[in-house]
Curated annotation (Swiss-Prot):
Family: Belongs to the anti-CBASS protein Acb1 family.
Residues that bind 3',3'-cGAMP: 12, 74, 108, 142, 148
Binding site for 3',3'-cUAMP: 12, 74, 108, 142, 148
Substrates-to-products reaction catalysed: 3',3'-cUAMP + H2O = U[3'-5']pAp[3'] + H(+); 3',3',3'-c-tri-AMP + H2O = A[3'-5']pA[3'-5']pAp[3'] + H(+); 3',3',3'-cAAG + H2O = G[3'-5']pA[3'-5']pAp[3'] + H(+); 3',3',3'-cAAG + H2O = A[3'-5']pG[3'-5']pAp[3'] + H(+)
Protein name in the entry: Anti-CBASS protein Acb1
A GO term, aspect molecular function: hydrolase activity
Keywords: Host-virus interaction, Hydrolase, Inhibition of host innate immune response by virus, Viral immunoevasion
Positions of the catalytic residues: 44, 46, 114, 116
Biological source species: Erwinia phage FBB1
Annotated InterPro entries: Acb1-like_C, Cyclic_Pdiesterase
Any one biological process term the GO annotation gives: symbiont-mediated suppression of host innate immune response
Pfam name, any one: Acb1
Function: Counteracts the host CBASS antiviral defense system. Phosphodiesterase that enables metal-independent hydrolysis of the host cyclic di- and trinucleotide CBASS signals such as 3'3'-cGAMP, 3'3'cUA, and 3'3'3'-cAAA. Does not cleave cGG or cA4. Besides evasion of the CBASS system, might also enable evasion of the type III CRISPR systems that use cA3 signals.
Amino acid sequence: MKKLSEFGKGLYVAAKFSESTLDALEELQRSLKLPNPVPRDKLHTTIVYSRVNVPYKVASGSFEIADKGKLTVFETQSGNRALVLEMDSDYLSARHSYAKALGASYDYPDYRPHITLSYNIGVLNFSGEYKVPVVLDREYSEELDLEWSDKD
């Protein structure tokens, strides 16, 4: 049972992927010749980024949560241009909605499931849709780190 003081620390939940998905993502990074590719062990999708800690139960299991994605450029908090693979995933959207129903906060107007491929692509531009079978390996949760930076 959590102590009341632990609920003020915030919550971060992310999805990690199967080895075959990680292989496909690394191949995509290589084929695009991405500068500053996110390392294999850091590839993930954020599900919850909440300044409020809620009693979220992480899920496990291995199943496909998306079969393709489109390349999108996001501006990061540090002002860099990140390249992400944005996905339509009913599963990830439902898990995010579950957290919101529990009272989780979210700093952005919409939840857009994605996997960051590079946190800094500079002035380069990328576009297109790519077939990448995204298979969930597990979810994990930890205390929200408001000091995290994509510069790390």
